[in-house]
Regions:
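N-terminal leader/targeting segments
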Residues: 1-81
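Generic serine detector
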Residues: 3, 20, 26, 33, ...
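A sequence-composition feature that detects small, non-aromatic residues
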Residues: 13, 21, 39, 63-64, ...
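Short amphipathic alpha-helical surface micro-motifs
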Residues: 27-29, 61-64, 101-103, 118-124
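Intrinsically disordered, low-complexity regulatory segments enriched in Ser/Thr/Pro
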Residues: 53-54, 58-90, 144-171
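Long, charged/polar, surface-exposed segments that mediate recognition or autoinhibition
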Residues: 76-108, 113
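Acidic, proline/glycine-rich low-complexity IDRs
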Residues: 96, 103-171
Length: 171
C-alpha cells in the first residue's frame, strides 16, 4: 500500500493539490505545489523537503511515538519556502496546503476502501517571540488510541490555529 500511494502521489501531487484547493475555494501558489512534489515519502511518512537531511530521521522517530504504522506527516517550514513565494502570498497558504493534502489522501484512501483517516494534530513550532518564520506541522492517519485524537477546525484558516477544535473530511 505504501509503495502504491508513494508512486501515485509523486505522479499526481501537484495537480491534485491544486484541484483540492479549488474545491476549498482558494488557489495554492505554484511555489507550494512545486515544493510539495519534491517532498520525501519515507517509510510510510510523507515528509517535506528538509535541510539538513539529518532531521528526517529525527522527525520519523518523533512521529513513530505518536502515530500508527500508516500515517502521513507533513512539515512546511516557511524559511524553505521564502524564495518560492512572492510578496503577495498570505500565511494562510500554508494552512491551505495542509487541507489540500489531507483532502487528497482522505479521498484516495476512501476510494480504495481504507478506513477514513483523521487529522491527528497540528502545531506551530514557535519557541521564541522573535521567530520570523515558524514551522507548521500537521499529521493525519490512524490514531493508536482515543487520547491521540486531535482536530483542527476547518474554519481556522490562520497561522495561529490551535489544537483542540474539530475538522471533518467529507468524501
Amino acid at each position: 500500500l505504501h509503495s502504491k500511494i508513494e508512486h501515485f502521489f509523486n505522479e499526481k501531487a501537484g495537480r491534485l493539490i491544486q484541484d483540492s484547493a479549488r474545491r476549498i475555494g482558494s488557489p495554492v501558489p505554484k511555489g507550494l505545489s512545486d515544493w510539495i512534489t519534491q517532498a520525501d515519502f519515507y517509510n510510510g511518512y510523507f515528509l517535506g523537503p528538509r535541510d539538513p537531511r539529518d532531521s528526517l530521521m529525527e522527525q520519523i522517530v518523533e512521529a513513530a511515538d505518536r502515530l500508527d504504522d500508516f500515517s502521513v506527516e507533513m512539515t512546511l517550514n516557511k524559511i524553505h519556502l521564502e524564495d518560492e513565494l512572492n510578496a503577495e502570498s498570505q500565511p494562510d497558504d500554508c494552512i491551505l496546503v495542509y487541507f489540500a493534502v489531507c483532502d487528497y489522501f482522505a479521498r484516495y484512501l476512501l476510494e480504495r476502501g481504507v478506513t477514513k483517516p483523521l487529522l491527528l494534530w497540528y502545531s506551530t513550532d514557535v519557541h521564541e517571540p522573535d521567530v520570523e518564520f515558524p514551522s507548521h506541522t500537521m499529521s493525519f492517519g490512524f490514531p493508536r488510541s482515543e487520547k491521540d485524537y486531535y482536530y483542527l477546525d476547518v474554519e481556522s484558516f490562520r497561522a495561529d490555529a490551535v489544537v483542540g477544535t474539530q475538522i471533518s473530511i467529507n468524501p
